[in-house]
Amino acid sequence: MPQPPVPRESRVRAGIVPPYLLLRIAAAEEHYDVAADAARRSLLRDEPMRELRVEGAHPGLLPHEHTRSATTGRDHDVEAEGEGAPVDAAVPEPAPDRRISDAQGAESLPGHLVRTEGQPATGDVAVDQAYDGLGEVWALFERVYGRDAIDGEGAPLEATVHFGDHYDNAFWDGERMVFGDGDGEVFRGFTQSISVIGHELAHGVTEMTARLRYRDQSGALNEHVSDVFGALTEQYAMGQDAEAATWLIGEGIFTELVQGRALRSMLEPGTAYDDDVLGRDPQPAHFRDYIVTDADNGGVHLNSGIPNRAFALAAVELGGFAWEHVGRIWYDALTGGTLRPNDGFAVFAAATLAAARERYGDVSREVAAVANGWRAVGVEPE
Amino acid sequence: MEVEVVRSGGLAGLRLTWTVEVEDQPDPEEWVLLVERLPWSDTPPAPPEPDRYTYRIRCEPHVATLAERQVTGPWRDLVDRVRDVAEPSRRRADVGGRAAPAQPGAPDAEGPRTTAPSDPTPAPPAPGD
Ligand SMILES: [Zn+2]
């Protein structure tokens, strides 16, 4: 592939656009911002709609949510007991505890605390996007899966924004989500995308539950789980069913100079971008194309395409809201205690099938869809 | 003498490679000093942090793999210097050319790895493992 040089000054200082990129600035604004803005509607305003949605399609959810209390704690297995239980008005509604810090362009953590729970918007776009996005992720985990925050016990959701100088990344450091502003040329700020915020928070959940080792197949599964809950956060926030969902991770993260829609496509891995500078999205969509590499902890961000597609195919086959069926099955598998840190694709696939049987019965559409998903990507559950 | 820095990982999984021919630099002696000062044998494996970068720094006969948070002090000096004088390449040597597809249910179908001997990373287990 030809390697168009990236002018150094533009890499170092945002705002200077290389001439070859100027040639193809798309006139189309795309719909990035529309999607992101819609997803950033305030948590409170969305709540009634969400509960209706959830209640309608999965009657077990709403009572379950209200049985959570100091006595039932975070255990998602209490759902059955909770079915039909009266709502106890004395139990306070759980709420997120968000804490957003600002690294002010330095690579030091945590930075200065600039917005805590309940405080009004700061006017700093990244701070407010992180705050709102964390609210959406918290809502998915708490309202759908009954998990209050990363640890299930309402611990603060910590994030740092404006990390580094034109820093082209976002990560989970074991305690907090960290977001760079991007270089302005390839990447915009990493708080632009709800799916990215959900992805980072989900790394924390995985660390607290299945502890999938961040290397090779278990690492690709760790990445996959983060993509799953990142995508579901966006779908839940926007009320999208599996058909309407984009299944993209990081939509809106690339600048308009990049020929691409997002970082990854869960439904069609390998198709998210095809750009002169970045090259083509290298994700495999089938196990026969599994990439063996030493880089990227054994290709964790590449091979995650394989389980991602299995998940998305199962969701589309079932239709409706993915967070209510496949999302629930995956959450059960992740938190069920059967997975071990070094487990690979086959064992994970089996765990999702077992979770589907447990929740929906041996002969159910859900079990069939999950089995079909794994079969389509060449993974044989064991 | 060639210095190569490969940055992989990151949320986007994009890989960048910077290469510097030390002899072509205006100050080759400084580069040699910098490289010799690096604690090549003192790079304990760090627990990976999800989505953080991994750096692989090579200057024959040395090679070191560092987590982003280990790239401090003289390592950081070197990486900053390399990034200052070299343009990154996005060549993906590992995609397409080195894929060793493992067949589900047939672990022995996994081909031999063409990894540099200096790399201790084991091949990922076939799904039957
Ligand atoms: Zn990740």
Region annotations inferred by a language model:
Chain A
Residues 1-195, 207-382:
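Zymogen propeptides/activation segments of proteases
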